[in-house]
Curated annotation (Swiss-Prot):
Enzyme Commission (EC) number: 2.3.1.15, 2.3.1.n5
Name this polypeptide is given: Glycerol-3-phosphate acyltransferase
Species annotation: Shigella flexneri
Pathway(s) it belongs to: Lipid metabolism; phospholipid metabolism
Periplasmic-side segments: 1-3, 74-80, 133-137
Upper lineage: Bacteria, Pseudomonadati, Pseudomonadota, Gammaproteobacteria, Enterobacterales
Pfam families: G3P_acyltransf
Subunit structure: Probably interacts with PlsX.
Location of this chain's protein in the cell: Cell inner membrane
Length: 205
């Protein structure tokens, strides 16, 4: 079945290239996430500029566009090596989307979706790591960074045959969070709920 893998890689990249953040913002009459807020077309920035409903829609779509190509390839019997490349292709599409001038998001939700078909136990542990980090720190970016750093070890424990491609995904996500890492180091990063606190202060009941 590996003969179909190159085609699945292309499909995964094209799926990843559909920027849900940009499309949802257009449909909802919101500012372009590439030029508003943090400038990142992802769920966290849509949360800042458009609220919870739009952000949830973006998050679900971004997870699915990573999950569906990998899941489809898995069901077709594609080998772990090619599954890893398909997962990476979906994330590359999200980060550098051909349909939107190669300016995309950071790939966290899409990577999470791409890893999900590998193991639901792994998915739960990864989600718990991200959520716990965000709840303790308030930083969505830190949750992504910590999850990316720990992911290869989780995968090695649950599904060791996928350790290499997941490590590549982790490196890709960490590279995309270079600016966030610098802001966290300088204590200049914005917490995920800061926008809502400011709004309540401006519009008290």
């Amino acid at each position: 079945m590996s003969a179909i893998a190159p085609g699945m890689i292309l499909i995964a990249y094209l799926c990843g290239s559909i920027s849900s953040a940009i499309l949802v913002c257009r449909l909802c009459g919101l500012p372009d996430p590439r030029t508003s807020g943090s400038g990142n077309p992802g769920a966290t920035n849509v949360l800042r500029i458009g609220g919870k409903g739009a952000a949830v829609a973006v998050l679900i779509f971004d997870v699915l566009k990573g999950m569906l190509p990998v899941w489809g390839a898995y069901e077709l019997g594609v080998s772990p090596f090619w599954l890893g490349l398909i997962a990476i292709a979906a994330c590359l599409g999200h980060i550098w989307p051909v349909f939107f001038g190669f300016k995309g998001g950071k790939g966290v939700a899409t990577a999470f979706g791409a890893i999900a078909p590998i193991s639901w136990d792994l998915t739960g542990v990864m989600a718990g790591t991200w959520l716990l980090t965000v709840l303790l720190s308030g930083y969505s970016s830190l949750g992504a960074i910590v999850s990316a750093l720990i992911a290869p070890f989780y995968v090695w424990w649950f599904k060791p045959q996928f350790t290499f491609p997941v490590s590549m995904l982790s490196c890709l996500i960490l590279l995309r969070h270079h600016d966030n890492i610098q802001r966290l180091w300088r204590r200049q990063e914005t917490k995920i709920w800061t926008k809502f606190k400011r709004k309540r202060e401006k519009d008290p009941e």
